[in-house]
Amino acid sequence: MTFLLSRTFISLTLRPSCSISMANLTTNAKTRLRGVVFDMDGTLTVPVIDFAAMYRAVLGEDAYKRIKAESPSGIDILHHIESWSPDKQQKAYEIIADYEKQGIDKLQIMPGTAELCGFLDSKKIKRGLITRNVQKAIDIFHQRFEVIFSPALGREFRPYKPNPDPLLHICSTWDIQPNEVMMVGDSLKDDIACGKRAGAFTCLLDETGRYGPDDFSVSGLQPDFKVDSLSKIQNLLETNFDLNP
């Protein structure tokens, strides 16, 4: 499947300081892109964590079914845990840590990641990382992949995705405006929401065709681009953006 340029690419709702002039759009001028920020689990790494099983273990079967029915776009387990008592939180985080450790033990780099990073390096485009996983997982990812993403923020950075603050922090660190950055991830409710709220371009990685128009309509979140493989992103960037340093 080739990349999808969404209708919102032309009518992006950005903060005033991040707006794109209609004059540029009508003359087909390409917008400058200076940085790409990636999600980690399911984007840079092959998805291996059984999130449904983890949610059941943390919430209990009845609560899991109820919350899932109330949240068709997905369960934000970290958000639910925040309101619990300290003892209950600790037990929940221990369960999550166990599942995440299993994921770390099975960590595999997503096909196309090395090639995409090489392309970004050749264009001097910065790359960062935002994950709701822990910093230890980021460190192991860096060790195994031997390519560094910087800044690389785990859930220790508060507030975490889908809040835009992690992405805005990276933009500030780079001294780059959000509308010169793209957020790439496999989660509509976390990655695309984070990017949209920050005023960045967004690209949804959807390998299995999980997301469709109904999901975008219900969530109110439409990515600017959608790809089924990281290998499609290089062509997407070259076609739609000015990549000159």
Swiss-Prot record:
Cofactor: Mg(2+)
EC class of the enzyme, as a word: hydrolase
Keyword annotations: Acetylation, Hydrolase, Magnesium, Metal-binding
Domain of life where this protein originates: Eukaryota
Gene3D superfamilies: 1.10.260.80, HAD superfamily/HAD-like (3.40.50.1000)
Protein EC: 3.1.3.-
GO cellular component labels: chloroplast; cytosol; endoplasmic reticulum
Binding, Mg(2+): 39, 41, 186
Residue numbers annotated as active site: 39, 41
Molecular function, one GO term: hydrolase activity
InterPro entries: HAD-like_sf (IPR036412), HAD-SF_hydro_IA (IPR006439), HAD_sf (IPR023214)
PANTHER family in alphabetical order: HALOACID DEHALOGENASE-LIKE HYDROLASE (PTHR43885), SUPERFAMILY HYDROLASE, PUTATIVE (AFU_ORTHOLOGUE AFUA_4G13290)-RELATED (PTHR43885:SF1)
NCBIfam families: HAD-SF-IA-v1 (TIGR01549)
Entry similarity comment: Belongs to the HAD-like hydrolase superfamily. DOG/GPP family.
Name under which the protein is recorded: Haloacid dehalogenase-like hydrolase domain-containing protein At2g33255
